[in-house]
Curated annotation (Swiss-Prot):
Region (Involved in Mg(2+) ion dislocation from EF-Tu): 80-83
Gene3D superfamilies tied to this protein: 1.10.286.20, DNA helicase RuvA subunit, C-terminal domain, Elongation factor Ts, dimerisation domain
Protein name: Elongation factor Ts
InterPro entries to which the protein is assigned, alphabetical: EF-Ts_dimer_sf, Transl_elong_EFTs/EF1B, Transl_elong_EFTs/EF1B_dimer, Transl_elong_Ts_CS, UBA-like_sf
PROSITE patterns (alphabetical): EF_TS_1, EF_TS_2
Higher taxonomy: Bacteria, Pseudomonadati, Pseudomonadota, Gammaproteobacteria, Pseudomonadales
Keyword Cytoplasm included in the entry's annotation: yes
Cell location: Cytoplasm
Length: 287
């Protein structure tokens, strides 16, 4: 059994919104397996869904540069949100994305190297660490982008259609954050997990019902799950009566890909314990 650490409990709490003790109990019951703990909590009716894995705590900004045929999206991290709003930081981010686009970079390493001198100057000036974290270049027949503030950036590529359509779909992706483009991309394992959760959650409702009825109920849940998880099956945010895939098809377009960046995805930022900090300061003062 995996050790039930405070970090593991914290992650489960962030993903489910449940209390610390409930999360610890669920993890203990699941033998330290966080995914099983989430499934068990969903099956018991404690939660309806869980956030995607990944602690989101780092600050910074997302930046995009595009010309309708190609785009570069980057993430630059800072230690505080205050710095991310300052002109010096914004100028560094803007210069970095311009450099990445102009040089047609496809990997973050050359950008980090090229911007290192400017980064050191910025760090020396603001007294806070700054890092270029990631970069992706996307090319296609039609490329549209959407930036939500400076925290979420999306790039969508189409075959056919126009840039405005790609931008509309990119805005939808920013709002809904789908996991997949097509239902066919959802793994059999994920579908099986969803099926098992549904059966456990509705155990009383399906008890005694004919197998074919249960099968229809499960099928309905899986259809809904696939619609929620895949972009082409989602209801378009600007017109919920139309699916995103149908929107593209009506315009004579095909969605080829989407890229979603959110500041801090997958980064765990240490959280200072105020009580411990005060205790440490008092101890130091006595020395």
């Amino acid at each position: 059994m995996a050790e039930i650490t405070a970090a593991l409990v914290k992650e489960l709490r962030e993903r489910t919104g449940e209390g610390m003790m409930d999360c610890k109990k669920a993890l203990t019951k699941a033998g330290g397996d966080i995914e099983k703990a989430i499934d068990d909590m969903r099956a018991s009716g404690a939660i309806k869904a869980a956030k995607k894995a990944g602690n989101v705590a780092a600050e910074g900004a997302i930046a995009i540069k595009d010309d309708g045929k190609a785009a570069v999206i980057i993430e630059v991290n800072s230690q505080t949100d205050f710095l991310a709003l300052q002109d010096d930081f914004k100028a560094f981010v803007a210069a970095s994305v311009e450099k990445a686009f102009a040089d047609k970079l496809t990997d973050v390493a050359p950008l980090i190297e090229a911007q290192e001198a400017a980064r050191l100057v910025l760090v020396g000036k603001v007294g806070e660490n700054v890092n270029i974290r990631r970069l992706k270049r996307i090319e296609g027949d039609v490329v549209g982008t959407y930036l939500h503030g400076n925290k979420i950036g999306v790039v969508v590529t189409l075959k056919g259609g126009d840039v405005e359509l790609a931008k509309d779909i990119a805005m939808h992706v920013a709002a809904s954050n789908p996991e997949f483009l097509f239902p066919s991309e959802v793994s059999a394992e994920a579908i099986e997990r969803e099926k098992n959760v549904f059966l456990q959650l509705n155990e009383d409702k399906i008890k005694g019902k004919p197998a074919e009825i249960v099968e229809k109920m499960v099928g309905g849940r899986i259809t809904k799950f696939l619609a929620e998880a895949s972009l082409v099956e989602q209801a378009f945010v600007k017109n919920p009566e139309v699916k995103v895939g149908d929107l593209a098809k009506k315009a004579g377009a095909e969605i080829v890909s989407f890229t979603y960046f959110k500041v801090g995805d997958g980064i765990e930022k240490p959280v200072d314990n105020f009580a411990d900090e005060v205790a440490a300061q008092l101890a130091a003062a006595k020395q």
